[in-house]
Amino acid sequence: MAYRTCAACNRQLSSDSYSRNQWSKGSGRSRCSGCVHGNTNVESIDPAQTARRNQSSRATFTHEALDNPFAAGSFRWVAKGKYTEGSRQGEACVCKWFKTGSVMEASFFATDLEASQKAVDLITKWNEERRIDRMVKVNLPEVWTFDSGSRWAGRKVLQEPFISNYQKFNSNTGWSDDSVPWARVMQALSHFTYHISGGRNVLCDLQGGIYRDGVVLTDPVVLSTSREFGPTDLGSEGISTFFAHHECNEFCSAQWRKPSNARSFYRPTAGTTMEHVTSQYSRPYMTAFSGYSVPYEDDDDDSYY
């Protein structure tokens, strides 16, 4: 991704922070979207403050936990384990693998990591706005491989810290739960990402845990006009569907852009919608993985932020 210093606020920002017109003016003349729209009172935040990382290089999972995942999304299984070294040693973690098995695995890993990094960039911009007095963070997963000698040696999973107090706030088809303040904040965040990206993206399918000092999200979907973020990226039709069902709330700004004549192309559902996926559905046992190291007897672990 290309970066450039804004001619007005002197911040080093990615191309997503500029409109196409401003970016075309070249270095030394381009002004970011925040400056163009009069929002210059923005304190820069390091993206590292937004990303919640493993901070470990090893974890362990029981065979029982892997053969009987404690959670499942629309297309992933989730098993709970524990970090065994690093600054998160002893803390709970999760590994995730795809229900389609190995058919689309490599492609899914790549787009998952790209979407997660894009989410970090977009959420960092939200945090810089200081529209609320809490931080929004997002788990940044890594692809880990199981040890040799284990039952599924060499198999790969997405590894990230465990999230407690889990709930879903919106989906990638316009569904949202506006019953609690944090859910309305998440709707505003989704709207903001469209504005700050110049109408190119909407961050949605927001889910995670509420903590004392903020929210931690996981598995976000990035909708893009270029449809570059995998099978959950429903493209321009997904973006239009979001706004067809979105009602601005107290956390939105009247200055944020919205598409004109938004139409709904999808039925709003709480689950994650995918398109154009070759499916070879697998039960947990068939795609489960052995521990990264010698499995331990799992207990009811506490979660950490």
Segments from the language model and where they lie:
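Short linker/helix segments within small regulatory modules
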Residues: 18-30
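ATP-binding glycine-rich phosphate-binding loop
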Residues: 41-90
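Short metal-coordination and nucleic-acid-contact micro-motifs, chiefly zinc-binding Cys/His arrays
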Residues: 2, 28, 74
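Conserved structural core of kinase catalytic domains
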Residues: 89-183, 215-240, 244, 248-253
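Catalytic activation segment of kinase domains across protein kinase-like and atypical kinase folds
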Residues: 159, 182-281
